[in-house]
Each structure stands twice: as structure tokens, then as C-alpha cells.
Curated annotation (Swiss-Prot):
Gene that produces this protein: Ssna1
Record-linked InterPro entries: SSNA1_fam
Annotated GO biological process: axon arborization; axon extension; axonogenesis; cell division; intraciliary transport; microtubule cytoskeleton organization; microtubule nucleation; receptor clustering
Organism of derivation: Mus musculus (Mouse)
Record protein name field: Microtubule nucleation factor SSNA1
Function, in words: Microtubule-binding protein which stabilizes dynamic microtubules by slowing growth and shrinkage at both plus and minus ends and serves as a sensor of microtubule damage, protecting microtubules from the microtubule-severing enzyme SPAST. Induces microtubule branching which is mediated by the formation of long SSNA1 fibrils which guide microtubule protofilaments to split apart from the mother microtubule and form daughter microtubules. Plays a role in axon outgrowth and branching. Required for cell division.
């Protein structure tokens, strides 16, 4: 009976030891879980902040692209109008030179036909 009692005591000691080891492993696992939950929370906060920042950057970018497009449109319209002004100026200059030439010829013809009698 003493052998059975000793064996039972031995089993009991091993059971207690195994339970203590399991409790220690559980505590370590709980510590790791808490660390990872903290890390998860930190990462979620970073993602939220980055998402908000990305939204602000996208809004700013959209406004700036719209402004650039407006600049492009204004520049294109202004350049087209300026080219029309240049063409009109060239046409006006050609007409003016032609008319001045015609007037010069007409004046020269008038002076020849009058023969300088007015003097």
C-alpha cells in the first residue's frame, strides 16, 4: 500500500507540475496576445491617420489638377487669340502698304499730268 501511496504522491506531484507549466505557458501566451493586440491597435491608428492624410492629399491634388487644367485652357485660348491678332496685324500692314503705294502712284500721276503748273 505504501508503494501505491508513493506512486499516487508521485503522480500528484507530476500533475501539479504539469498544471503549473501549463499556467506559465498560458500566461506567456496572454502576454504575447496583449503585445500583438497593442501592436494591432497602433497599426490601426497609423492606417487611420495615413488614410486621412491620403484623403487630404487627394483633395489637394484634385484641386491643383483642376487649376492646372484651367491654366492650360486659358493659355491655349490666349495663344489662339494672339495668333489671330498677329494675322490681323499682318493683313492690316499689307493693306496699308498697298494703299500707300496706290496713293503714292496716284499722287505721282497727278503731279505728272498737272506738269507742275501749280508752282
Amino acid at each position: 500500500m505504501t508503494q501505491q501511496g508513493a506512486a499516487l504522491q508521485n503522480y500528484n506531484n507530476e500533475l501539479v507540475k504539469c498544471i503549473e507549466e501549463l499556467c506559465q505557458k498560458r500566461e506567456e501566451l496572454c502576454r504575447q496576445i496583449q503585445q500583438e493586440e497593442d501592436e494591432k491597435q497602433r497599426l490601426q491608428n497609423e492606417v487611420r491617420q495615413l488614410t486621412e492624410k491620403l484623403a487630404r492629399v487627394n483633395e489637394n491634388l484634385a484641386r491643383k489638377i483642376a487649376s492646372r487644367n484651367e491654366f492650360d485652357r486659358t493659355i491655349a485660348e490666349t495663344e489662339a487669340a494672339y495668333l489671330k491678332i498677329l494675322e490681323s496685324s499682318q493683313t492690316l500692314l499689307s493693306v496699308l502698304k498697298r494703299e500707300a503705294g496706290n496713293l503714292t502712284k496716284a499722287t505721282a500721276s497727278d503731279q505728272k499730268s498737272s506738269g507742275g503748273k501749280d508752282s
